[in-house]
Each structure stands twice: as structure tokens, then as C-alpha cells.
Amino acid sequence: MPPSVSRALLLLAGLGCLLPGFLADEAQETAVSSHEQDHPACHRIAPSLAEFALSLYREVAHESNTTNIFFSPVSIALAFAMLSLGAKGDTHTQVLEGLKFNLTETAEAQIHDGFRHLLHTVNRPDSELQLAARNALVVHENLKLQHKFLEDAKNLYQSEAFLVDFRDPEQAKTKINSHVEKGTRGKIVDLVQELDARTLLALVNYVFFKGKWEKPFEPENTKEEDFHVNATTTVRVPMMSRLGRYDLFHCSTLASTVLRMDYKGNATALFLLPDEGKLQHLEDTLTTELITKFLAKSSLRSVTVHFPKLSISGTYDLKPLLGKLGITQVFSDNADLSGITEQEPLKASQALHKAVLTIDERGTEAAGATYMEIIPMSLPDSITLDRPFLFVIYSHEIKSPLFVGKVVDPTQH
């Protein structure tokens, strides 16, 4: 790399913590005006976020069909959209089009306003759904940033900024990792393994989620059972069990059974269990239109659900993945990030994303809390998620997928 081209390190940390989880104490209380609630700008960007989520999922899935997948498309999109504030020319266009925005149909101002409203919505303190998204700019102490970029990052993306000396990579790495670890309450540690001394700027984002099942499982019903990783591999997992009223239906287009489980606070988990031998078909055929249809479909019935307790994570180098979606120039020596600073030519040298998922029985924090519902005295349907399946965690408030994933082996952390 020519010495005239400095490095900008782009870091992204997405955390999904489902039962249990923690909401950062320092989360600022941000009110949403009634005007914004009447005109949810984040809904305008929702179709693009959903398309980006599935496109990125397919790129990740193509890399390996034997590992779990878990990432936050919202986290990744937030960080790159914020980066686009300082990008110009083809660099700028590639980033936004790579996030699946049609720039002839959606004005750039609407895109950023959509993300601004999304952040206001997810960071609301009055929601039963504990959800927070945070951005930070980690700036080399001698780097002077453009005033407009700093102001836009703060006003549109609620970004805070702090200074480090990247010439001391170990100290800078410790500060960044400590920031992420603190913000995710210890769920994401050591995000940055190596740091180049030529780094001038780091963008950090994390999304934090604590979901409470609307209908929690009882721990005493959890038993060790088989999970069939593939035709030759079976592992033992703690399998949760619950009889309740759920939306359950079979989709012939996907050759899959769809289970919808709701969280308190206007969020839903869609679990897609493919028919035997149809996992690849499901991954190739799933569309945003089908997800929207599943979320709207009502097929409530008595169902015995058998679901594996799990704690999985995903760590991704986004540079090659996003390159396949057309985002290449920002990582090259031809990057134009002069809207961030004119002091030094910048490029993004690295883009990291780490996400952590925990699913267990607990639906409330209060000891002894009980959920009761009336079950008709007919023979219930049953679904056992004992082989690889896909899932989408969806926020109805922002009409976008918060997290997307695949469980291949629940014992693989």
C-alpha cells in the first residue's frame, strides 16, 4: 500500500442476546416526537434493510454450510450508512447501493433520516423490548475531522467520539475492546485482535437486544435430547419444551415449517425448519416477500414446541462479503473519504462484525413469574427443532430484521 494512503479501520460489533441479556445502563433516554411516530421514516428504509439482510446471509452461507450463522444486518447497515456521510463519488454510491438502496427512488437525505428515526425508535426507554444501538467514532488524537461529518454523525447516528493514539496499537486496541465489552456488558470481548499503527479512525457499532418470550418455557421441562447436525453427526442438547398457542404452518414454496414466537415489546422470532434434505432449497428460495407474508399470517393453534437451548456466535470479516455485494472501493486505495477528513487520504482497511446469541427458557426476570393460557382439549400439533434451521428476529416497530441466523450445531459456540 502506498505510504500516502492512510488506513481507516471500520469495526462493527452486533450483539443479540435473547433471554437473558442486559440493557446498557448508560443508554440515553431519547424521546420520539408524536410527529415522528405518525410518519415513521425508518419504514421507508425497511425494504432495503430486509433485502440487504438476505443478500448478506446468502454470501455468508456460501462460505460454509457446516457452521452456525448469526449477524445483525441493522448493526452493519448503521455503521456503513454512517461511513457514507463522509464518502464521495463512486465510494459513496457503492456503499449505499451495496446496502440495497435505490438512489434514483430514495433520496440520500431520506436514507439518513430513516436511520435517525430507527435509532430513536430502538433506543426508546419506555419499550418492553430492551433494545439499544450505539455508534462511536474512535479518532487518532492528531486527526482533524470535517465539522459537517462530526455533526451529521452525532445528529443523525447518535455517535459519540473519543480520542486514542493509534501509534500505540496495544493501548488503542485495549480502549476499543473495553468500549465494546462495556457496552455489551461483557458479551463481546476482544473484538479487535490486531491493530495497525497506521490506523487513523475506527467506527464502532453495536446493537444490543434483550428479548422476553411472551410465552416463556418452564425450566423443569427441559430435557437432554438428540440434535441431528447432519446424516452422520448427532449431538446431545438441552431441549426446551412447551405446550401453548402458536402460529405454525407449512410453506410448500420453501418446503419448510414456519414457527412464529413473539417477544414482549413488539418483536417476533420466525423459525424456519426445512423438510428433510431441503435446507439448501430454503436458503435459495427465501425472500423478503415471504418473510412479510409469514409475519402477517395468522394460524394460531395448540402446539407442543421442542426447541434447543443454545448460545452461538458469529465473527465475520466483512470486506470479502460486502465486496460480493458491490462495496469494494471504500477498501481500496481509490477510496474517497474526503468528507471525513482532508488531512489524510483514508480507506477502510478492515471491517469486523461479531454477534452473540443466547436463547433459553427465561421469559421474565421476576422469580416465580408464570404465564397461563387456555389450551383446547384437542390433540396438539408438534414441532421439534432437532436439525438445522434458519431464524429471523424481527422488530415490528422498525419493520426490519434485527438479526438473521442459522443453527447447524447448538453445541458449536
From Swiss-Prot:
GO terms for molecular function: serine-type endopeptidase inhibitor activity. Plasma. Its main location: secreted. Residues 368-387 are annotated as: RCL. Residues 1-24 form the signal peptide. Glycans are attached at N65, N102, N230, N266. CDD domains: serpinA1_A1AT. It is found in: Secreted. The record marks M377, S378 as: Reactive bond. GO terms for cellular component: extracellular space. Belongs to the serpin family. Inhibitor of serine proteases. The primary target is elastase, but also has a moderate affinity for plasmin and thrombin. This is Alpha-1-antiproteinase F. It comes from Oryctolagus cuniculus (Rabbit).
